[in-house]
Swiss-Prot record:
Region called Disordered, residue ranges: 127-154
Keyword Cytoplasm part of the UniProt annotation: yes
Protein function: Acts as an anti-CsrA protein, binds CsrA and prevents it from repressing translation of its target genes, one of which is flagellin. Binds to flagellin and participates in the assembly of the flagellum.
Gene3D superfamilies hit by this protein: BH3618-like (2.30.290.10)
GO biological process: bacterial-type flagellum assembly; regulation of translation
Localisation per UniProt entry: Cytoplasm
Name of this chain's protein: Flagellar assembly factor FliW
Organism per entry: Rhodopirellula baltica (strain DSM 10527 / NCIMB 13988 / SH1)
Subunit details: Interacts with translational regulator CsrA and flagellin(s).
Keywords: Bacterial flagellum biogenesis, Chaperone, Cytoplasm, Translation regulation
Length: 154
């Protein structure tokens, strides 16, 4: 599959390199296939690039790289589209917005990825996490995927 990305130029990807978001993302419900692209300049950041729209790419981070105590509190039904099994691990990412020096991340609506099945969903958490949590200016090391044991379903 060829993606003409505004940010990365032309990308050649196999279908197995894409994540399927059956419900799309909040505000982009019609966009279902996304590629996770590492940022060439910052190991703490990746980009979720739409396969259908070259002009749609979201900066994402592992929130635990910046907020080690971050936990996702959601209902079991919210994870049903990921088709998780008892051994599945969920990788949690949050979107980044703003400008250098004033970056924020959305801890209220994380992206959940089932790496084995290449499925994703965006959920709204059951707690009062901020939608615009300021990010520390110091670059953080990449965090490991958040195991399902650390995703608390209500």
């Amino acid at each position: 599959m060829r993606i003409d990305s505004h940010r990365f130029g032309t990308l050649e990807l196999n279908a197995d390199q894409l994540f399927l978001f059956p419900q799309g993302l909040i505000g982009m419900e019609s966009l279902h296939q996304w590629a996770l692209i590492p940022d060439p300049d910052n190991a703490s950041v990746a980009w979720l690039q739409s396969a259908a729209r070259g002009d749609r790419a979201l900066a994402v981070i592992s929130p635990r790289a910046f907020f080690p105590d971050y936990r996702v509190h959601i209902g079991r039904r919210d994870l049903s589209s990921l088709h998780l099994t008892s051994g599945s691990e969920v990788y949690v990412m949050t979107t980044v917005a703003g400008h250098v020096g004033k970056l924020t991340t959305n801890l209220r609506a994380p992206l959940m990825l089932n790496l084995d099945r290449r499925l994703g969903c965006q959920v709204i958490t059951n707690d009062d996490r901020p939608m615009r949590q300021p990010l520390p200016t110091v670059a953080a090391e990449s965090a490991k995927p958040l195991p399902t044991s650390q995703v608390r379903a209500a």
